[in-house]
Amino acid sequence: IQAHSAGILLHQGVYYWYGEDKTLGNFNRTGIAVYSSKDLYNWKREGVALAKDSVPEQFRESGVCERAKVLYNSRTRKFVMWMHLDDKPYAVASAGVAIADKPAGPFRFLSYSRPVKFDFGYPEKDRTNQRELGNTYREMNLFIDSDGRAYAFYASEDNWTMYIVRLNAEFTGPEMPRAEGKTWARILVRQMREAPAPFKHNGKYFLITSGCTGWKPNRAGYA
């Protein structure tokens, strides 16, 4: 299965597994592949949900298109994909958004941006230019609550702090106007956590994260 950094969506009794297709190499020159299953054991390749050549040129070839996650918006009846987009030096660090009419796509790329611009004490030397462009967006996940509201969890501030951002009604961007503590929040401040996995169980919210050690293993943490 070529679907790295996977995100799984359950829709009408079918599981859809989205992830990076690295058949042509580590830089994911193909795009985001999707597989389907009814039992989480037998998987069928449905094709490429988001082709790499459909994202802006700087993210093709040696650029980064990863961590794709998909939600179904029952209001718009659209499938919405969020992903981490970056250049090879990991300096662009932005969120990409695409939509589709069907879970297997094809997804149409909409835009990329950094959802929050907040002065956390910008470093004097910052290769990601957060002061001008907004705070970085890297390893991420999506979460939809029981009330239908959706949220993006992601590593920001050059991976030092994690953000939670409530999405708009269409799930295609942050809820506006942005207000810290109301529509978005800083969590795990200065703890360098990434790969967030949020879920809700018995009325409580849980978040599992990884430390930022690259490909080296580390202990998972939970909150």
Segments (PLM) and residue ranges:
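Carbohydrate-active catalytic/glycan-binding domains of CAZyme proteins
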Residues: 1-223
